[in-house]
Amino acid sequence: MGVISVQLVVTMVMASVIQKIIPHYSFARWLLCSGSLRWYQHPTEDELRTLAGKQQKGGKSKKDRKYNGHLENKPMTIPKDIDLQLETKCIAEVDTLALHYFPEFQWLVDFTVAATVVYLITELYFCVAEPSGEMNISVVWSLLVLAFVMKILFSLTAHYFRLEEGGERSLCITFAFFFFVKAMAILIVTENYLEFGLETGFANFSESAVQFLENQGLESQGPISKLTFKLILALLCALIGAFLTFPGLRLAQMHLDALTLNNCKVTQTLLHINFLAPLIMVLLWVKPITKDYITNPTFGKDNVPLMSEKTYDTLRLWVILLLCVLRLAMMRHHLQAYLNLAQKGVLQMKKEAGRISTVDLQKMVARVFYYLCVIALQYIAPLVMLLHTTLLLKTLGGHSWVIYSDESLPCLSNEDSSPAEVGQSQMEASQTVAQLSVALGGLRTVFSPLLFRGLLSFFTWWIAACLFSTSLFGLFYHQYLMAA
């Protein structure tokens, strides 16, 4: 019980932290209110009157019209080329109360931080204590994080479907079909080019499932066919692609604006690396381009591999984590580039002829700030998906964080051999408990690290591929189509 209680204590402490401390010391609130982000305030009607050269008059205006006893005020309009300078202000905590989706943003970020801390403590515990036959509770936390991310992305995508115009709805459906076809094409590529391990994992899953059912006295040819398995994966890929359509398109626009906003060469280089980060992740699983040149080089006389396959798998995990940290560090530049759209819209308005109502002008400026958390969610949700999918890949896939150690066995290997021993040791105490332990041990052999390694490698690669595809399309759209 002492071994099991360590993870339970960590979970209970973190749950208490989420409930008691995080509402007062929120990392999500710090990201927005640390003083590094400035938003543009919309002008008041009196300021617009003064700039337009109109004096505020008391009483009824001559332009007021009376219909059926009701007084109708015609909205005031001002010239579009008015000399308007927007005032900026640092985002304060009180300003976040008016932001749309701020509770969702705060919950996702703070819960992700808590889940990541639990994961780090649990990994340290497993490396030091090396418990056998114990479930890693950080897996549950990571799965909850992914569930919250999918819920929020679904909510944001559903918002586009509720719009009356319908352009966003058509774009989302189009990309969903595109990603479905793309996923079907990717799933037929042999593992000589894309080494996810799906084929090996599915074969191991089918054989173990048949053997498990036979041990239970049931006859079966397998739980699922390979075609059905890949069709389900393709449908999930289409759903993920639809959810990541608008985050990728928005990232492209913020990337272009952030490059214009920052003149520092180092910052611009980091912005370029951040934009190309999904492509780097995608190439890490393309065997002829990366892995073959490192683990089986063809140049030189000796053909000595630079590293083993296990070391390469570990290095791949570290590269993804570093790119996720870079994306989080570049978040402030992207959000500030988005907030500058208010000033950009006013400058564009000044180039146009005609008049605009004061209400429309105020809405145009205020809308940018009020939807800041929507943009922040579109930026950070894919990052959280990549991060915790990678963490699950390490834990459930049986990888290691140690690059130089090729002989160390992952903790999951010890777990696979322990359930039967635990069940046998308790057979004298309770026959029912023994049978349950054997059944759970059989399920662990069915859902083996090979299966999780293939699935999670594929989904990690797919999330990165969707992000790069949509952001590349957004870059082409904003750079060329909008300019034309």
Curated annotation (Swiss-Prot):
Glycans are attached at N136, N204. Keywords: Cell membrane, Glycoprotein, Membrane, Transmembrane, Transmembrane helix. Pfam families: Tmemb_161AB. The chain crosses the membrane at residues 108-128, 137-157, 170-190, 229-249, 266-286, 368-388, 456-476. The keyword Repeat does not apply. Its main location: membrane. Essential for maintaining normal cardiac rhythm in the developing heart and for neonatal survival. Inhibits potassium and calcium currents in the cardiomyocytes, this assists in timely action potential repolarization and thereby maintains normal cardiac rhythm. This is Transmembrane protein 161B. It comes from Danio rerio (Zebrafish). The gene is tmem161b.
